[in-house]
């Protein structure tokens, strides 16, 4: 029955579903596992960097993106769709919100804008839903925030969650290991242990990518002598830092 409605991008099936969104979720479920964990003093985003060829340069592969100095994003699904949404999020943050208010948008505002773009693709003719799910991590006045955005445009705040091929296994593991009052360092270790449960093959600094939202990194500010200036909270761990964490597992 669903096949009768799959030709239309915006027609509901009798069961109340938009079939194209189901197909978009299938694309997400075929992507590599990505996860996010919120701690008391930060957030961890982690994912597998899977190359289609051993000849590919691992340094050119990146799935975690900087949006603003305090917000980062990771995805599972179709890479080209993700890059479009990253460009949109950066444009809204830098040339839209900051130009008007002289500050970067709070995480929730940015999430709402990205979710609106994704939702519009489910009701407009001549387009298709974005084949990605996103995990967006940021630091606001209220502390660290972690959101998941799906192809339908729905978004939810999470303490810890996972998306991608082995999301169910990862979530089951996170439910067992996550505790209230978790520190950022412990969250990084749990993230690596979770990926270890879902990844087939070797884990090292070239096959794992980790981004953290934590205390201001003033050494990354690049500006000296500005009173009250704070460094960015979001940064990606270097391959060597990831290797050090893996050694201590």
Curated annotation (Swiss-Prot):
Record keyword ATP-binding present: no
| Database matches in SUPFAM superfamilies | N-terminal nucleophile aminohydrolases (Ntn hydrolases)
GO BP of this protein = proteasomal ubiquitin-independent protein catabolic process; proteasome-mediated ubiquitin-dependent protein catabolic process
Could you tell me the keywords of this UniProt record? Cytoplasm, Nucleus, Proteasome
Superkingdom field: Eukaryota
InterPro entries, A to Z: Ntn_hydrolases_N, Proteasome_alpha, Proteasome_alpha-type, Proteasome_asu_N, Proteasome_sua/b
Protein purpose: The proteasome is a multicatalytic proteinase complex which is characterized by its ability to cleave peptides with Arg, Phe, Tyr, Leu, and Glu adjacent to the leaving group at neutral or slightly basic pH. The proteasome has an ATP-dependent proteolytic activity.
Mind telling me which PANTHER family this protein's record contains? PROTEASOME SUBUNIT ALPHA/BETA
State the oligomer form and interacting partners: The 26S proteasome consists of a 20S proteasome core and two 19S regulatory subunits. The 20S proteasome core is composed of 28 subunits that are arranged in four stacked rings, resulting in a barrel-shaped structure. The two end rings are each formed by seven alpha subunits, and the two central rings are each formed by seven beta subunits. The catalytic chamber with the active sites is on the inside of the barrel.
Could you identify this protein by its name?
Answer: Probable proteasome subunit alpha type-2
Q: Which organism is it from?
A: Neurospora crassa (strain ATCC 24698 / 74-OR23-1A / CBS 708.71 / DSM 1257 / FGSC 987)
The gene designation is pca-2
């Amino acid at each position: 029955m669903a096949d009768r409605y799959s030709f239309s991008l915006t027609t509901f099936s009798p069961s109340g579903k938009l079939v194209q969104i189901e197909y978009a979720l299938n694309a997400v479920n075929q992507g590599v596992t990505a996860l996010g964990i919120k701690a008391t003093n930060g957030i961890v985003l982690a994912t597998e960097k899977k190359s289609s060829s051993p000849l590919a340069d691992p340094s050119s592969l990146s799935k975690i993106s900087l949006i603003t100095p305090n917000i980062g994003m990771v995805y599972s699904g179709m890479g080209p769709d993700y890059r479009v949404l990253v460009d949109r999020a950066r444009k809204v943050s830098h040339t839209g919100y900051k130009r008007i208010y002289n500050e970067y948008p709070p995480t929730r505002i940015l999430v709402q804008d990205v979710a609106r773009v994704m939702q519009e693709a489910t009701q407009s003719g001549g387009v298709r839903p974005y084949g990605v799910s996103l995990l967006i991590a940021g630091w606001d006045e209220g502390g660290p925030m972690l959101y998941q955005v799906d192809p339908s445009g729905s978004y939810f705040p999470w303490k810890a969650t996972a998306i991608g091929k082995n999301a169910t296994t990862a979530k089951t593991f996170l439910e067992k290991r996550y505790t209230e009052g978790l520190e950022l360092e412990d969250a990084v270790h749990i993230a690596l242990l979770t990926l270890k449960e879902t990844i087939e093959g070797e884990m090292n600094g070239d096959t794992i990518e980790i981004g953290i939202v934590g205390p201001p990194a003033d050494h990354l500010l690049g500006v000296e002598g500005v009173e009250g200036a704070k460094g960015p909270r979001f940064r990606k761990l270097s391959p060597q830092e990831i290797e050090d964490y893996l050694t201590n597992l």
